[in-house]
Amino acid sequence: MLDIKWIRENPEALDAALAKRGAEPLAQTLVALDEKRRSAVQKTQDLLSRRNAASKEIGAAMAQKNAELAEKLKAEVAEIKETLPAAEEEERTLSAELIDALSRIPNVPFDDVPVGKDEHDNAVARIVGEKPRWNHTPREHFEIGEALGYMDFERAAKLSGSRFTVLTGPLARLERALGQFMIDLHTREHGYTEVSSPLMVRAEAVFGTGSLPKFEEDLFKTTDGRYLIPTAEVTLTNLVREEILDQEKLPLRFTALTPSFRSEAGSAGRDTRGMLRQHQFWKCELVSITDAESSIAEHERMTACAEEVLKRLGLHFRTMTLCTGDMGFGSRKTYDLEVWLPGQNAFREISSCSVCGDFQARRMNARYRGKDDKNNKFVHTLNGSGTAVGRCLIAVLENYLNEDGSVTIPDVLLPYMGGLTKIERAA
C-alpha cells in the first residue's frame, strides 16, 4: 500500500506511475477522499477537545457558585455527547474508504523498469547456457510422462477435475528430489532459514501481501473464511506482520517448500494440457526482509540464488526484466527466470523475483528500529520462487530426454534418487 502523505505531496508522480502500468489517474480522487477524512478527524478531535475543556469549566463554575454557567456548560457537553458518535462513525467510514482505495492501487515501478504493455515488452537481462542439441525430435513433458507410464491425467481428473496431475514411481520421486535439492541449496549455501508454516491463512495475511481485496477470485477460500495460500510468500512475509524488528538483525531470509493453490481464474484456455498450469503445485519460495537501504542489492542476490538452481541442473534459461505492464501488483521491479522447454520450442517462466519496497510492510505494519533512529521505519520485503518444482520437473523431462524415450537424471539430483540414474518406461 502506498503512503497517502507521499501521494498528497506527489500527485503527478503517482499518476505518471499508474500511466506506466496502463491505469487511469487516481491522485485527485485519493487526495479529495483524504481531505474529507482529515476534516472528519479534525472535527472529532475538536469535539473531544471541547468536551474535555467544557467538563473542566463546569468544575470551575461550580466552585465559583455560578450555577447558570455550569448548567449551560452541562448542556453543551450533553450536546457534544450526542453529536460525537456520528462524527466518529463518519471518521471510521472515511478512513475505511481511503484504506480500501489505497489497497487497490499497485506499487510504483522503479525508474529503470522498462515501460511496456505486456510480456512482449519485457527486456532480456541475461541468457545462461545453450539449447540442447539432439538428433531426436523434442517432445512435450506430458507426452514423455505418459509414455513412461508415470504421469496420469485421467486419474487426476477422476479425483479432482481439470488442472491436476498424479505422478507415480520415479516421477513422484523426481518431484520430491527437486524440492529437496532446492531447499538444501538455499539453506546450506544461500543463508535462508527453512520454515514449515500453515497452508491456510486468515484474510489479514493475504491482504498483507497484496492478494486481497483486488485478486480474491484467484484464491481458494474455505467455508470458515480462511484462504489456501497461493504461494508461501504469504506465510513467510507475514511472519513479521505487526512486529518491530532490530535493524542489526536484518536481513531475515526465509524459505519454504509448500504446495501452492490457485484458481487460475484468468487462465481459461491457456496451457490446458499437461502440468504447466495447475490448481495445486509444489514451489520453493524465498522471502527476504530488509532495511530500506539494502533491498535493491538483496533483489539481485535473491535472483542469483534462484538462477543457481537452474545452473546446477544444467538448464538453459534467460533472465527477463519485466516491463511495467507485466509486473505484479506489489512489485517495484521483477526479474522472471524463463527456462527453455524444447518440446514447446519456447522459454517459459519458472521463477519470479520481486522487490516490493515498503508496499507490503505498510499493509502488514511491519517495521524496524535503528540504533540512532527516533522513529521506526517500515521494512522492505522481497519474494521469489527458488523455484517452481513442477515446472522444473517439466524442464528436466524435456531437456534430459533420450532418443529411446528414457530420461537421464541430472547429476545434482543423483544423491536424492536412491541409485536411480535414468527413468525408463514402466514394465
Swiss-Prot record:
Record-listed E.C. numbers: 6.1.1.11
Catalytic activity: tRNA(Ser) + L-serine + ATP = L-seryl-tRNA(Ser) + AMP + diphosphate + H(+); tRNA(Sec) + L-serine + ATP = L-seryl-tRNA(Sec) + AMP + diphosphate + H(+)
The entry's keywords: Aminoacyl-tRNA synthetase, ATP-binding, Cytoplasm, Ligase, Nucleotide-binding, Protein biosynthesis
SUPFAM superfamilies: Class II aaRS and biotin synthetases, tRNA-binding arm
GO molecular function: ATP binding; serine-tRNA ligase activity
Predominant location category: cytoplasm
Any one of the GO BP annotations: selenocysteine biosynthetic process
Cell location: Cytoplasm
Disulphide bond pairs: none
Positions that bind L-serine: T231, A232, E233, E285, S385
EC category: ligase
Residues engaged in binding ATP: R262, S263, E264, E349, I350, S351, S352
One Pfam short name: tRNA-synt_2b
CDD domains, per the entry: SerRS_core
A GO-annotated cellular component: cytoplasm
Assembly and interaction partners: Homodimer. The tRNA molecule binds across the dimer.
Family label: Belongs to the class-II aminoacyl-tRNA synthetase family. Type-1 seryl-tRNA synthetase subfamily.
Task of the protein: Catalyzes the attachment of serine to tRNA(Ser). Is also able to aminoacylate tRNA(Sec) with serine, to form the misacylated tRNA L-seryl-tRNA(Sec), which will be further converted into selenocysteinyl-tRNA(Sec).
UniProt note: domains: Consists of two distinct domains, a catalytic core and a N-terminal extension that is involved in tRNA binding.
PANTHER family the UniProt entry points to: SERINE--TRNA LIGASE (PTHR43697:SF1), SERYL-TRNA SYNTHETASE (PTHR43697)
Protein name as it appears in the record: Serine--tRNA ligase
Upper lineage: Bacteria, Pseudomonadati, Pseudomonadota, Alphaproteobacteria, Hyphomicrobiales
